């Protein structure tokens, strides 16, 4: 699959993993996210390596990220979407999600899931809705796996 590269408002949106910085992703997820505080670098790197990733770059520095965990045929789970605080309010999360959702292979997926505490409005713009029949879904949840008991996930 050929990497995407879009210039947007002085930022670069790309799916090229060679341009991404796993150390920056780890730093943000482990220190700033509410869903994976204290996550070890090795886990972030393994997740990165095994996902379809998208990033926002400013002058070569990674300031945003998201990933689809997918089989590329029927299912995907959208995860770890963020934009660093100084760059928020510029439509960058929206542009990342839009770029992902516009891919032909993504349009052909039967189911795309995500979990969010505070970005329902963003995802609703792309067709995401609350689960209607949540009784069909089951989960194993281990919220303290990275040693942070305050995580809401």
Predicted regions span which residues?
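Hydrophobic pocket-lining residues that define ligand/cofactor binding sites across diverse proteins
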Residues: 104
